A protein has these predicted regions:
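A charged, aromatic-enriched C-terminal amphipathic alpha-helix characteristic of glycosyltransferases
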Residues: 172, 186-223
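Conserved donor-binding/catalytic core segment of Leloir-type glycosyltransferases
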Residues: 44, 50-69, 75-82, 86
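Membrane-proximal helix-turn-helix segments that form the acceptor-binding/catalytic region
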Residues: 1-18
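Short alpha-helical donor nucleotide-sugar binding micro-motif in glycosyltransferases
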Residues: 118-123, 210
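Acidic donor-binding loop of glycosyltransferase active sites
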Residues: 121-133, 146
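Short hydrophobic beta-strand element within catalytic cores of glycosyltransferases
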Residues: 127, 147-151, 160
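Nucleotide-activated donor-binding/catalytic signature segment of Leloir-type glycosyltransferases, i.e.
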Residues: 95-117
Length: 226
């Protein structure tokens, strides 16, 4: 693997500018490439998601079924608390997760976009137990006016605001998530504030930031050559 590292580092040196999708990734760029990166988070199309006046009685996970996503934590916690959980997704971890699911947990498999939007709008909260570089699904939940209960590492720290758009659990364990779910029962959230927060990551904001960055660097380079 040594030659791959050498090639990768040499290739990075030829990059004019780095754009990272999160501060989490920008830190890795600094560490491994010793280069700075501007952070421009990926977009969520807020206009595709709607608020609902009706609160559902279930928690929601939308995820690829892979071990590192830690969907098992969400299933185990809801099993133990007897909470309703709907899980959308598919992947290599499906059989193991299906075997874990108790009577209050429903694995829906793949569903169409319209159904996913309905599930977001009607859930009590969105569970995000994995550690991701950024994570779009929490923002889709917020765009639907629903709070997020997230593992407090990685990209979730850049989208979830404690007590405003959701809450965190500190350890990636069932017990830690159970503590957060119990704490959630005592909390209240304003769905309109959740929506407003998601709109900070709207695709129109993303396009404007990308355009501004490209224009700035283009003008800097052209100005330097004149």
């Amino acid at each position: 693997l040594t030659w791959i590292r050498v090639w990768d580092y040499a290739s990075a040196a030829r990059v004019d500018y780095f754009i990272a999708n999160s501060e989490n990734v920008a830190k890795r760029i600094r560490k491994h490439y010793r280069r700075e990166a501007v952070v421009i988070p990926p977009p969520v199309r807020c206009r595709l998601f709607q608020l609902s006046e009706n609160d559902g009685d279930y928690f929601l996970v939308v995820s690829r079924f892979q071990e590192y996503k830690r969907v098992d934590i969400a299933i185990d916690a809801c099993n133990k608390l007897g909470l309703k959980l709907k899980v959308v997704g598919d992947g290599p971890d499906y059989r193991r997760l299906k075997a874990m699911a108790g009577p209050t947990v429903e694995l829906l498999g793949r569903v169409d976009d319209a159904h996913v939007k309905e599930l977001y709008a009607g859930c009590r909260a969105f569970l995000f137990p994995g550690e991701e570089d950024f994570g779009i699904t929490p923002l889709e939940a917020m765009a639907s006016g629903r709070p997020v209960i997230a593992y407090g590492k990685g990209g979730a720290l850049e989208t979830v605001v404690e007590g405003v758009t959701g809450t965190f659990f500190k350890e990636q364990t069932t017990d830690s998530l159970i503590d957060a779910l119990r704490r959630f029962e005592t909390m209240t959230f304003d769905k309109h504030k959740l929506r407003e927060h998601a709109e900070k990551f709207d695709d129109e904001v993303f396009k404007a930031r990308i355009k501004a960055f490209v224009e700035e660097k283009y003008n800097e380079r052209n100005g330097a050559q004149e």
